[in-house]
Each structure stands twice: as C-alpha cells, then as structure tokens.
Amino acid sequence: MEAIRKQAAKLREQVARQQQAVLKHLGHVNADAVVVDEEELHCHQKLQDLYSSTKAAKRLQRNIVRGLEGFIATGTKVVEIGLKFAEDFKKYGDENPDANTPLSRVAHHFGTSYKSVEGERETLLGVLSEQVCEPIRTMIYSAPLEDARHLVNHYDRLRQEVEAQATDVLRRRSKLKESDISEEAYIKLKNSESRLAELKSSMKTLGKEATKAMLEVDDQQQNVTSQRLRALVEAERSYHRNALDILDKLHSEMIAEEEAIGSSPKSLPLHIEDSASLPQQEPNSNSSGEIKSNPLGKIKASRREEIKSNPQEVTKPSPKDEMKSSPQEETKSNHQKEIKSSPQEEIKKSNGSDDHHNHQLLSQNDSYFLAKVVHPFDAQAPGELSLAVDDYVIVRQVAGTGWSEGEYKGKAGWFPSAYVEKQEKAPASKIVESNSKQQ
C-alpha cells in the first residue's frame, strides 16, 4: 500500500510539471501561477525521506525490544538453573562430612564462583531491561513521533488539494481563452486562483512545520537508539569481564588444590598396605614408612554397631573378619598381653637412642608398629579408642574395613586407619608415657 501511494505521488508531480511546462510554452501563465515550485518539491521530497527513515528506525526499535524481551526471559531461566547448579556444589562442599578433602574444597569454590557468575548475569539482565528495553519501547509509542507523522499526513492531504485546485485553475483559464470573457467566468477564475494561493501558503507553512518535527523525531530516534545499543554493549562487556575475573580466580584455586595434592607424600593408607602384605621394614631402614592419610575420612556407622566389647578390652573384629584372619593375626593377639605386661622400668633404664626405645617395645612382634595421630577421634561406641593429635599409638592389626586396632594410654580399641600415620621413629618420652599408662 505504501508503494502504491508513493507511485501515485510521483505521477501527480510528473503531470504537474508537464502542465506547467506546456503553459509556459504557450505563454498563458507565468512560472508561479499554478503548480508547485521547486522549493515545495524539495520540502515534499525531504518529508518523504524523513518518513521512511523514522519508519525504518521504528521497525528496528521494535525488533530490538522483541529480541531483548526474549533474551531476558531466557536469561532469567538460565539464572535459575545456574543458581541451582551452583547451590548443589556449595551444599556438597559445606555439608559433606569430609569437608576438608580436596574435592570438597574445590566444590565449595566452584559453587561460590558460579553463584557469583549468575549474579553478574542477573545484573546484566536488569540493565538490559531498565536501561535499554524500556527507553526504546517508550520511544516507539511516544507522542512526538505520532504528532510528527500526523503533520506529514496532513501535509500530504493539503498538497493533494493544491494539485486539485491548480487543475481547476488551468481548466478555467483554458475556457476563457477559447471563448469570450464573461464577468461571471472571470470572477470564478479569480476566486479559484485566490483559493489556490491560500492553499499553497498553508501547504508551505505546514511543510516547514512537519519537516522540523520529523527532523527532531529522526534525530531523537537515531541518538537514543545508538546510546541504548552502546549501553547494551557496555553491559555485556562488564558482565563478561567480571565473569572472566571470577573464573580466573576459580581456575587458580583449582590449580592450587591440584598442586597441593601433588606435593603431598604419595603413600598407601594403612589398610591397603596391610592387605598388600608388604614386608615390615627395620627401624634403621632408609625408606620412609610414613603413610599419607585423609584425616577427615568418613566413618561408617555400621562399623560402630559391630563393636560390642568394653573399651578397656581389645575388641575383636566381626565373625566375617575372623574367618578371613591369617595365622599371623593370631600371633598378634598372643603378643598383645606381652606388650601390656612389659615392665616400665626396663624402658626407663634404657639409655639408648629413640630407635632403641622403639626396638625394645616392638621387637616382641614384627607385625606391630607405631603410628602418630594426625587427627583427633572421639570414641562414640563401646570398643572404640579415643585419640589425641600428635600422640603415638601402638597398632596391632589393620582390618580391611578401614579400621585399626591398637593401644593408646593404657586402653585398647578400634579407630579409623586414616586418622594415624605410620612412623619409623618416635620420641622416647611418648613411648614411656604410653607404657606408664598401660601399667
């Protein structure tokens, strides 16, 4: 429809120019007597260009608003999913019993970082909605644009009236030329010419007013749309820059955790070492017997229920473990009483080094060894043995269930294997203190 209207306007202008040229050639009228002049044609063309420009800009603004609304709706859903995703990691890192393990720490950092990233995304969506989408939507339906378009439409109607009136003037003048001039015909001609002059004057005034209004609207559309697009880009840059900083920090924390794990001693836990039946090393051996452990290993509740005996006595493993026990484990139980009944005076009188103390206490059974407590353990069931950090315990046997049996401060019982580290040497004071408690 718009194309048809433009084509009709071009045809009218072409006909008007042809009529004006013919009349000039015949000498009936002067250049400004009937049809529009060049200034008016220029104004009309300018209004047509401005109308097309504002219409295209309005279409672009509608596309921007429609696209941003979909982007914000989708982004809001992404934020909800991302926050739930991050919360699951934080929950694992904060509520997991092994809260100090590398995975727990990494999960905590991961959840915290991704929650911050989603917070930045939420900020971005707020900026897009308030600073980009709303101003453009307001301009689409603003009064200045509608008023300017109303003036242009009024100008087009008035221009059509001018063309029609000019045609009427030409018709009357042609009649006066062909026949005798009557007073009535002359009066009608003058009235028609006067009407044409009034319409042309109104058209010029309205054309200037419509051109000014359309220029203001066009400038406003261009400037505001460009500014809002720049605000959109700045918001996107800020979001990606902040998200990148957060992810860089998370990456550094994860690398640090991996390096910390790689730099720690790489040795097997107690129960793995026992099941592998490795030969017992001598106290003076050069190889280290220290065992890498996880001080916050998870304690199975089912194992607590299996331990029935008094904490003062040595708790026996379950019947299933007894069936799997070897003659070597029976030898461990036979030597248990010998260690408990060893006289304290013999250890106190020895004047040798720490190796001599360890050898005197443990030489009765090669399968026994000393272990240093690296994490405290509070006994919560009969048969369990409480431990204190930096003290030493005599380990009698290591079960495949992750628990070990040993003596500590005159008491015997079970404790998690991961809470102690095997030692080749121990301070003499610790051994004397341990033996004195047993006596």
From Swiss-Prot:
> Which segments carry the region annotation Disordered?
277-362
* Domain BAR residue range list: 32-263
Task: Kindly state which keywords UniProt assigns to this record, in alphabetical order.
Answer: Cell membrane, Coiled coil, Cytoplasmic vesicle, Endoplasmic reticulum, Golgi apparatus, Membrane, SH3 domain
Polar residues bias locations:
277-291
Pfam entry (one): SH3_9
Q: In which tissues is it expressed?
A: Highly expressed in flowers. Detected in seedlings, roots, leaves and stems.
Residue spans with biased composition (Basic and acidic residues)?
Answer: 318-358
Q: Kindly list the places in or outside the cell where this protein is found, as annotated in its UniProt entry.
A: Cytoplasmic vesicle, Clathrin-coated vesicle; Cell membrane; Golgi apparatus, trans-Golgi network; Endoplasmic reticulum
Under SUPFAM superfamilies, the record lists: BAR/IMD domain-like (SSF103657), SH3-domain (SSF50044)
Cross-referenced InterPro entries: AH/BAR_dom_sf (IPR027267), Endophilin_SH3RF (IPR050384), SH3-like_dom_sf (IPR036028), SH3_domain (IPR001452)
Domain SH3, by residue range, is 366-425
Question: What's one GO-annotated cellular component?
Answer: endoplasmic reticulum
Function, as annotated, reads:
Lipid binding protein bound strongly to phosphatidic acid, phosphatidylinositol-4-phosphate and phosphatidylinositol-4,5-bisphosphate. Binds actin in vitro. Involved in trafficking and modification of clathrin-coated vesicles.
Quaternary structure per UniProt?
A: Interacts with the auxilin-like protein AUXI1.
Tell me what this protein is called. SH3 domain-containing protein 1
- Organism encoding this protein: Arabidopsis thaliana (Mouse-ear cress)
